[in-house]
Regions:
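Hydrophobic/aromatic-rich core segments of domains that either
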Residues: 177-271
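Secondary-structure boundary elements
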Residues: 98-173, 181, 255-257, 279-287, ...
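Glycine-rich, flexible loop/turn motifs
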Residues: 13, 48, 93, 98, ...
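Glycine-centered loop/turn motifs
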Residues: 77, 132, 213-215
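Linear, non-domain "peripheral" regions
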Residues: 1-124, 128
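Actinobacteria-biased recognition of intrinsically disordered, low-complexity terminal regions
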Residues: 289-301
Length: 301
């Protein structure tokens, strides 16, 4: 599937601010299931945009605006081609999670992190769930996905920074909450799990249903990936109770939301502001990729 994506963020400040320094994470990655065809960032006021890959491998676009300004607009436009990822089909014994090399390579995705810290209640629920699952890491990851997918999708009941325990006790939230809770339960069970930020071409964030028209307004999305020994990362979308597919577009991966927040920055001035964010996605007819290729398979450990 080929998709055009337009990400827009607009800040309106109460009074003019200055010395604005910002980091944007909105660029689709190139990996084993998607290839970036085109990407461009513009800002108003205009600025010079520099780019680098952060510690987690996510592209970061940085820009600064020194002169006073009462409004900031950031537009990121991308074209990306995706394909359906391969799903693990063979059972993987859970004992393989304890292999020293695998454990050491994934240690950062086994530990608690700022938004993925949990108490005994979540831990107990995870182990009770695991007790009814066959000796198979893939089945275990699927069971955690299914359990989290049973939560209710509810907007406005949580905010960035809400704890995993609160999401679990409230029984609902949005995609970031689902991804954080799934990561917590997987890590508790010894399965490395990472948070993924991206876009989803869908008519409804709560169901993930496909789009009849070729263009739709969406929001940024989040899901989780579980590391399967000897296979790679298994991507699951508990918000929409589905495997990650060709309508999912990955931006970046990290321990939790903080590692892949779309836009963050600092400035000098009154912090009061209004914020508007919009994302539009358009499905295109497939065309030859030319010299753009999917990245080396990330199924390798």
């Amino acid at each position: 599937m080929r998709l055009d994506i337009r990400y827009l963020t607009r800040f309106r400040y109460a009074t003019a601010i200055s010395e604005s320094q910002n980091e944007l994470r909105a660029c689709p990655a190139t990996d084993h299931r998607q290839a970036l065809v085109h990407y461009h960032v513009t800002t108003e006021p205009a600025s010079r945009v520099a780019s680098y890959l952060d510690y987690w491998g996510t592209r970061v676009d940085t820009f600064g605006i020194r002169e006073p300004h009462a409004q900031l607009e950031v537009v990121a436009e991308a074209t990306v081609e995706t394909q359906v990822p391969v799903r693990p089909r063979t059972a993987v014994p859970t004992a393989s999670l304890q292999e020293a090399r695998f454990h050491d390579l994934h240690l950062e995705f086994l530990q608690p992190s700022p938004h993925v810290s949990w108490s005994s209640g979540v831990a107990r629920a995870a182990h009770e769930l695991a007790a009814g699952v066959d000796d198979d890491v893939v089945a275990l990851a699927q069971a955690v996905h299914d359990r989290v997918a049973d939560l209710e999708y509810r907007t406005g009941v949580t905010a960035v920074g809400v704890s995993v325990d609160e999401v679990f006790s409230e029984g609902g939230g949005v995609c970031q909450d689902f991804a954080h809770l799934a990561a917590a339960m997987l890590r508790e069970l010894g399965v490395p799990a990472r948070y993924v930020s991206g876009y989803l071409f869908t008519a409804d964030d709560a169901t993930g249903e496909d789009v009849i028209d070729d263009e739709v307004e969406v929001e940024t999305h989040a899901w989780v990936e579980a590391a399967i020994p000897g296979w790679g990362w298994f991507a699951l979308d508990p918000t929409n109770r589905q495997d990650v597919g060709e309508r999912h577009v990955t931006i970046g991966r990290g321990r939790d939301y903080d590692d892949v927040a779309p836009l963050r920055g600092v400035f000098v001035g009154d912090q009061r502001h209004e914020l508007d964010v919009s994302v539009s996605m358009r499905r295109l007819a497939l065309a030859p990729l030319g010299d753009v290729a999917f990245g080396r398979s990330m199924q390798q450990q």
